[in-house]
């Protein structure tokens, strides 16, 4: 066995030794100690008496110990060589009593108190747990001193000093020490039941404190458990999964296995209290208290398990402008049909018909046509529409003078310009190449007839000056310069070689 395996070594020097010392002369003095030297090498008495015996004088005890050490050694023991026969070797040959510690050192009586201070003031908790208290050792020493040689040849206190393993392992040596010591003066040894095993804490000094602590600890944990259970009971819905827990019945429902004993694991549903034989059956069980909440879209009947998903889905069902636009043209179409029947339909190829759908028409327009009640957002769209009406009336052969509200509403002009317009009648007619008759003056663009040339010129200036582009080679008129250019390139390719005046301003003569 390796050295230092059983006993913890420390920095402080102790009288314990684990090997034979060859050159020391103090060993003989230790063996010849009047107090406990002879207890190590003296052979056992043939019949130890448990009762107390009177201690012999110190001189006789010293001579007896010396004689026993030099001459009375057993056979298995090595030949005596002075005091070295009592060192660590075969202790069973010198003392047949049961020894529980293989390291039984030699000690002096006068160093007992110093040994107590060294061995029990160590900083290691292991040594404090492994060895008894100094009071018990001192008490044992007092009792052993009274017993003398009748205690099996041991010094007072040796059973407790040199057998720490016995104190930790069992009660055999303590019982033997009690029997060997017998009733003597001094305090009794501590009972074996009071000696605790190593690694355990000492019991509390009072017995009233542990129950108080034990009562306080559960009291501190109970409110937490109650609060947790109460919180779990409040959670009865799942907003994401769409599940809800219904309220339980008043009486607890009976288990499925009627009349059978309770299952071993007691796999019980915590909601409906139904019992199952195994956890797999409990996992597959569909509780009657758990219901699925469905959120259905009222527009398309689509089902969702979360109300937030339904709200996101319903954003796609906002009212669209297509149905409103489809309902709006119904009265407008009726008005166009009436206008189509009243003036009739025939017009030139380049002029739109009044009954046609105009892309500029709008229900919320600010400019309204008094013929068909159609509204336009811009005056230009309304003028274009009125020209179509006038061309239709001219083709029918019954031209009517446009109402005054059309001209006044669209182009309100000052009245003082009328004489200047009348003075420039001849020049304006010559520029446009118009042949005015004595009876009436027709508008070359829309075919309206006027009583005077000034009225016709005013009509041309206000209504057709900026938007009408007449063709030089044919009586067709256009409302934009690109339209006139396309017409000339398509219908008059041979005359396109000449320089064409795209726009002829109508101005009165100075």
Swiss-Prot record:
Where is the segment annotated Required and sufficient for interaction with KDM1A?
2-7
State the tissue distribution. Expressed in pancreatic duct cells. Expressed in several tumor cell lines of neuroendocrine origin including pheochromocytoma, medullary thyroid carcinoma, insulinoma, medulloblastoma, retinoblastoma, pheochromacytoma, medullary thyroid carcinoma and small cell lung carcinoma.
SUPFAM superfamilies named among the record's database cross-references: beta-beta-alpha zinc fingers
Cell location:
Nucleus
What the entry lists under PROSITE patterns is as follows: ZINC_FINGER_C2H2_1, ZINC_FINGER_C2H2_2
Give the record's keywords alphabetically: Cell cycle, Developmental protein, Differentiation, DNA-binding, Metal-binding, Neurogenesis, Nucleus, Repeat, Repressor, Transcription, Transcription regulation, Zinc, Zinc-finger
Composition bias of kind Pro residues appears in: 43-59
Q: Where is this region: SNAG domain?
A: 1-20
Instruction: Give the GO biological process terms.
Output: adrenal chromaffin cell differentiation; cell migration; cell population proliferation; negative regulation of cell population proliferation; negative regulation of protein phosphorylation; negative regulation of transcription by RNA polymerase II; neuron differentiation; noradrenergic neuron development
Mind naming one GO cellular-component term on file for this protein? transcription repressor complex
Stored Gene3D superfamilies: Classic Zinc Finger
Zinc fingers typed C2H2-type, residue spans: 267-287, 295-317, 367-389, 441-464, 469-492
Induction (UniProt): Up-regulated by transcription factors, such as MASH1, NEUROD1, NEUROG3, NGN3 and TCF3.
Q: Which molecular-function annotation in GO is an example for this chain? A: zinc ion binding
Bias type Basic residues, positions: 1-12
Q: What is known of its domains?
A: The C-terminal region is necessary for NEUROD1 promoter DNA-binding and transcriptional repressor activity.
What does the function comment of this entry state? Sequence-specific DNA-binding transcriptional regulator that plays a key role in neurogenesis and neuroendocrine cell differentiation during embryonic and/or fetal development. Binds to the consensus sequence 5'-[TG][TC][TC][TT][GA]GGG[CG]A-3' in target promoters. Acts as a transcriptional repressor of NEUROD1 and INS expression via its interaction with cyclin CCND1 in a cell cycle-independent manner. Negatively regulates skeletal muscle-specific gene expression in endocrine cells of the pituitary by inhibiting the Notch signaling pathway.
Instruction: Summarize subunit and interaction data from the UniProt record for this chain.
Output: Interacts (via the SNAG domain) with HDAC1. Interacts (via the SNAG domain) with HDAC2. Interacts (via the SNAG domain) with KDM1A. Interacts (via the SNAG domain) with RCOR1. Interacts with SORBS1. Interacts (via the N-terminal region) with CCND1 (via cyclin N-terminal domain); the interaction competes with the binding of CCND1 to CDK4 during cell cycle progression and increases its transcriptional repressor activity. Interacts with HDAC3; the interaction increases its transcriptional repressor activity.
Protein family according to the UniProt entry? Belongs to the INSM1 family.
Q: What is this protein called?
A: Insulinoma-associated protein 1
Q: What is the lineage of its organism?
A: Eukaryota, Metazoa, Chordata, Craniata, Vertebrata
Gene behind this chain? Answer: INSM1
